Structures are given as structure tokens and as C-alpha cells.
């Protein structure tokens, strides 16, 4: 089964860019409608959902993509994997949703967080079911190499979510209205995904047991270790908000969440690469193409570093212009945490494709050890720094925790058997970033209008960065030719 890595990355990254462009004008509308306090409550619920999702999904999203992509002799293999994982998904999500609802019904939630959170937790119980169904549908499509089908569903989902969320929030429903928007959008996306799947697989597979020689224990073992790994990864992502909200209050949590949203713009390409590389590298590991894996990992890691450094320089320089214009003057407090987060976000960005290749081999034990080191460091620093410095302390702690992921996972990759930094060209990329900063920082300072600065500086910065990257050898002509040859024809025609 051949795959086009570039097509997969472009499909996922392209969908994420469209989702971000859609969210770009609508997020500040939602933030201003909710206010900083309610937005902080919403951020807390998203963080809770992120941590709970680890146990609810049970490793299904990664497991489906890894195993359904493998080229097995059994012609019914894909149907067996789909049916097996669908049943596992239902087995995980239904009891989990009941537990969340019982926590709200019993008064535990209101006694700890406040009465307004009771309704939020009831809605999250429904949202977990909707997201689980959507995750199964999308992961099967992706595992089959149909990212060009799975990713437009994300765009459609946001077209459903935003009108409902903003409309209900403006009508006075608040955070509950936003959660209702998530539920409706996720359910509709799930239905569309299964309609698309019906063209490639037999949906009746969910009712039929796989044969006795089906490797259930292997798949379950992968899932169990994936749950641990995903819990650690989500702990890294949400520890700051989960600690900041009760310690420093909803206002600071809201400002900090705004900084996180902007910083995570850097993850569009890294997440796309991470998503595609899991099932792509799984094929290569299964056919013992270790040399090709090392070459692929080194190239992808360099491209990810190149792109994220460009974005980080732009965000760091333009933060003063962008944040108040985007979120409103009240959110100027988000600027410093945003800049503090950027270094760590770049490090985690580079670590993402390395992590995915390790998952593709199934070497989860080593990945768990590596991630545990970063999580422990992140937790310790957040516990120490948040009580002392509030959201700035959270930003410093989280940035160090994110950055340590690169150190730990490079060590892990070498133990697994591939070298992701063999072609990183770190000095050349940093030189391109430095030259770009020297050009655009005074340019931004010289432009009085924030809006004009946001229109003028980015394209100039892009030209300077790419030109410098080529001049110093961070990006060479062979790279450009290779990218051109592997880019889908319709994308080439779009820019020709």
C-alpha cells in the first residue's frame, strides 16, 4: 500500500489552516461575548476534556491508524480492525460518560468548582460520546490513506460549531451554549465520516467478531500503553491551566488561555506531520526499511523546525500589535506569557514527528519513559512557579516542560534505532531567524498602526526568511525540487 506523505501532510495542515482562518475572526467575538471570567471557565472545561479524553478514547485514534494501515495478507483485515476498535471505543466511552454525569448529579462538581459547572459536566458527558464516534470515523479514513476525505470534515465541523456557539453565548447561555455547539458539530461530523466509510468498509463489521487468530492481545497491548502515553502528553498540555485556574483565578486563566491559543498556531505543520507519520512509518517499520525511516525523520524534523522558527519569530515580534487588536485591550496581559511560551512550543514542535515515528514502530515503553521525564519537570515547575508568579510562572514552567520534550525524545529515538537530527542544520536555521528578526523588529516598531503592521510585516518577513534560509543552506535547491515533485498537482496548479 503506497502512500504520499506530502499529500497527507498537506491535507491535514491545509484543513487546520482553514479551521484557524475560520476561527481567526470568530474567537475574539466568542471571547468578548463570554468575558475573561467565563472564558477562563471554558478553558478549564477544555482542559478537563483533554485529560478525560485520554481514558475515554482508550488509544483508539492511534491504534486504528497504526493497524488498519498495515499491509496484511488477510483481505478482511481492515474490516476486522474497524469492527474491533469500534467496539472498544463504545466500551470506553459509555461508562466514562456515565461517571462524568454522576459526578455532576451527586454534587461533587458543584462543591469543588461551583454550581455553574454542574451543567457543564452534564454536557461534557454527551460531548465525549460525540467525539468518540467522530474519532473512530476520522481515524479509519486516515489509516486508509484518505486524509483528503477525513480532514474536510474538520472544516465542516467548525462551520456548524461557530454559529451555534456564538449564537447561544450571545443569547445568555454562556459556556453551556459553547459546549452545545461542540456536541452538535461533533455528532454531525461523525455521521458524515461513517457515510464516507461505508464506501470502503462494511459497517456491519461492528456487529461481527473477528476470527480467533486475530491478534487481539497485540492491539490491546498497544492501546493500553497508548493510554499511558496519551495521559502523559495531555498532562503536559493541560497541567498549567488545571493548576492556574484554582490558584490564580478565572481571569488569569482566561488571559493565559488566550496566550496558549496564539502560541499553538505554531503547531499546524508539526501536528499534521505527527498525524501522518504514525501510520506512514508503521508501514516502513513493518517492512524493516530503517535507513529510509532515518532519512525521512531527519528531513521532516528539519522542515518542521524551519517552519516553526519562522512562525515563532513573527508571533514574538507582532505580539504587541496582534493580541490587543485580536482579543481586545483587556488582553494585553496575555502578551508576556505568549512570548515566554514560544521557545518551548518550538521545541515541542520539533519533537512531535520524532514521537510519531516511535509510535509507528510500537516502541511505546521507551516513549513513555521519555515523556514522563518532561511531564515530571513540567508539573514540578508549575507547582513551584504558579503560586509565586501566576500566569507568567505558568508560562515559564510550561515552556521549559515543552522544550524538554525535544531533549528526551531525541534520546529515545536513538535508543529505538533512528537519528532524527542528522540533517537539522540548526545553526543555519537560527541564522535565518536572526536575520529576519533584525529586519522586521524595527519595521514593526516604525509602523504606528497595528493593523497596518500586521498587513505589511508578515509578507516581508516571509521573503526575508526564505531568502536567507536558501542563502545560508538551511533550505537548498534539492529540497525545493523534491517538494515540488511530491506536491499534488492540484496544489501546484493553484500557485502556477
Roles of regions detected by a PLM:
Residues 122, 153-202, 260, 373-378, ...:
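Hydrophobic alpha-helical transmembrane segments
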Residues 172-175, 179-182, 193-237, 280, ...:
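Interhelical loop/hinge segments that connect adjacent transmembrane helices in multipass membrane
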Residues 56-73, 143, 263-308, 355-359:
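Helix-loop junctions and terminal segments of transmembrane helices
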Residues 10, 15, 19, 42, ...:
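Transmembrane helix-bundle signature of multi-pass secondary active exporters and lipid flippases
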Residues 106-124, 315-349:
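Interfacial segments at transmembrane-helix termini and the short loops linking adjacent helices
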Residues 441-496:
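Membrane-proximal transmembrane or re-entrant/amphipathic helices at the cytosolic face
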Residues 3-61, 93, 97, 121-127, ...:
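Signature of the first transmembrane helix
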Residues 129-154, 176, 342-374:
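Membrane-interface junctions at transmembrane-helix termini in multi-pass inner-membrane proteins
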Amino acid at each position: 500500500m503506497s502512500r504520499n506523505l506530502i499529500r497527507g501532510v498537506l491535507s491535514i495542515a491545509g484543513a487546520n489552516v482553514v479551521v484557524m482562518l475560520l476561527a481567526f475572526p470568530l474567537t475574539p467575538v466568542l471571547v468578548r461575548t463570554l468575558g475573561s471570567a467565563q472564558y477562563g471557565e471554558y478553558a478549564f472545561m477544555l482542559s478537563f476534556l483533554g485529560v478525560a479524553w485520554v481514558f475515554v478514547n482508550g488509544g483508539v485514534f492511534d491504534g486504528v491508524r497504526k493497524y488498519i494501515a498495515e499491509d496484511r495478507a488477510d483481505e478482511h483485515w481492515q474490516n476486522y480492525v474497524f469492527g474491533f476498535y469500534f467496539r472498544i471505543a463504545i466500551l470506553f466511552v459509555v461508562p466514562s460518560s456515565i461517571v462524568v454525569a454522576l459526578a455532576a448529579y451527586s454534587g461533587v462538581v458543584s462543591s469543588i468548582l461551583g454550581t455553574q459547572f454542574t451543567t457543564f459536566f452534564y454536557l461534557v458527558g454527551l460531548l465525549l460520546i460525540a467525539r468518540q464516534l467522530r474519532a473512530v470515523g476520522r481515524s479509519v479514513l486516515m489509516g486508509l490513506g484518505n486524509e483528503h476525505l477525513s480532514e474536510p470534515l474538520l472544516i465542516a465541523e467548525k462551520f456548524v460549531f461557530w454559529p451555534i456557539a456564538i449564537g447561544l453565548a450571545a443569547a445568555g447561555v454562556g459556556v453551556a451554549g459553547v459546549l452545545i455547539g461542540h456536541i452538535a458539530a461533533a455528532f454531525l461530523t461523525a455521521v458524515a465520516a461513517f457515510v464516507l466509510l461505508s464506501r470502503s468498509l462494511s459497517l456491519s463489521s461492528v456487529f461481527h467478531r473477528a476470527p480467533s487468530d486475530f491478534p487481539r492481545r497485540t492491539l490491546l497491548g498497544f492501546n493500553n500503553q497508548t493510554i499511558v502515553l496519551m495521559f502523559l502528553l495531555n498532562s503536559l498540555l493541560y497541567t498549567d491551566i488545571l493548576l492556574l485556574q484554582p490558584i490564580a483565578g478565572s481571569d488569569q486563566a482566561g488571559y493565559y488561555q488566550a496566550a496558549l491559543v496564539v502560541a499553538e498556531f505554531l503547531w499546524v505543520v508539526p501536528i499534521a506531520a505527527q498525524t501522518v507519520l504514525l501510520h506512514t512509518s508503521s508501514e516502513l517499520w513493518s517492512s524493516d526499511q530503517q535507513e529510509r525511516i532515518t532519512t525521512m525523520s531527519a528531513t521532516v524534523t528539519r522542515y518542521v523546525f524551519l517552519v516553526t522558527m519562522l512562525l515563532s519569530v513573527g508571533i514574538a515580534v507582532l505580539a504587541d500589535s496582534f493580541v490587543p487588536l485580536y482579543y481586545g485591550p483587556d488582553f494585553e496581559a496575555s502578551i508576556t506569557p505568549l512570548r515566554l511560551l514560544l521557545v518551548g512550543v518550538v521545541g515541542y514542535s520539533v519533537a512531535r514527528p520524532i514521537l510519531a515515528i516511535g509510535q509507528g514502530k510500537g516502541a511505546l515503553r521507551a516513549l513513555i519513559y521519555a515523556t514522563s521525564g518532561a511531564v515530571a519537570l513540567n508539573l514540578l515547575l508549575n507547582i513551584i512557579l504558579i503560586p509565586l508568579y501566576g500566569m507568567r510562572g505558568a508560562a515559564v514552567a510550561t515552556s521549559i516542560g515543552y522544550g524538554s520534550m525535544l531533549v528526551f525524545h531525541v534520546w529515545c529515538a536513538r535508543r529505538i534505532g533512528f537519528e532524527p537530527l542528522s540533517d537539522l542544520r540548526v545553526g543555519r536555521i537560527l541564522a535565518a531567524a536572526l536575520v529576519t528578526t533584525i529586519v522586521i523588529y524595527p519595521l514593526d516598531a516604525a509602523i504606528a498602526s497595528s493593523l497596518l503592521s500586521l498587513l505589511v510585516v508578515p509578507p516581508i518577513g516571509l521573503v526575508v526568511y526564505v531568502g536567507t534560509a536558501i542563502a545560508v543552506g538551511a533550505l537548498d535547491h534539492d529540497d525545493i525540487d523534491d517538494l515540488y515533485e511530491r506536491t499534488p498537482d492540484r496544489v501546484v496548479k493553484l500557485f502556477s
